[in-house]
């Protein structure tokens, strides 16, 4: 936020807004070593949205996380996206994650990667991962990337 030349007052206001939005107010004065892994990840995501970016690129941000934490953080990103209006480009190899998060999915070919298909996903959030339409879309995407 310093790089955007925001005043100290504006930076502090935005920091407090994001901390409140993420339910992290009580950790405002904590050091990273004092945070749990999940809280630290929430801070990282909040920090990215705090800049009010027009576009946020997230390249497999949940790669090392357990499934429970992954689901939780996916919902956090959806909530922040709705609250801020930031466009999020999410890169993943996880089909279920793509179908859960995205409004649009680009299916790529094998190397050299080219766009094979652009798929719009018109399901409301939060998405029901066991719902028939979700399962149908997930199966369709899986079928499109099979090369074996």
Set out the residue ranges of the language-model regions.
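Conserved ABC ATPase signature
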Residues: 31-35, 39
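Helical segment within the ABC ATPase nucleotide-binding domain
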Residues: 70-84
């Amino acid at each position: 936020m310093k790089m955007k030349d925001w005043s100290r007052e504006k930076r502090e206001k935005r920091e407090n807004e994001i901390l409140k939005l993420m339910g992290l107010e009580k950790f405002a004065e904590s050091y990273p070593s004092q945070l749990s892994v999940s809280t630290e990840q929430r801070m990282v995501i909040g920090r990215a949205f705090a800049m009010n970016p027009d576009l946020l690129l997230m390249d497999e941000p949940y790669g090392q996380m357990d499934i429970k934490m992954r689901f939780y953080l996916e919902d956090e990103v959806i909530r922040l996206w709705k609250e801020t209006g930031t466009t999020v480009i999410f890169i993943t190899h996880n089909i279920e994650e793509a179908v859960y998060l995205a409004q649009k999915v680009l299916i790529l070919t094998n190397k050299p990667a080219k766009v094979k298909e652009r798929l719009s996903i018109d399901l409301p959030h939060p998405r029901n991962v066991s719902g028939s339409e979700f399962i149908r879309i997930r199966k369709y995407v899986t079928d499109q990337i099979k090369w074996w």
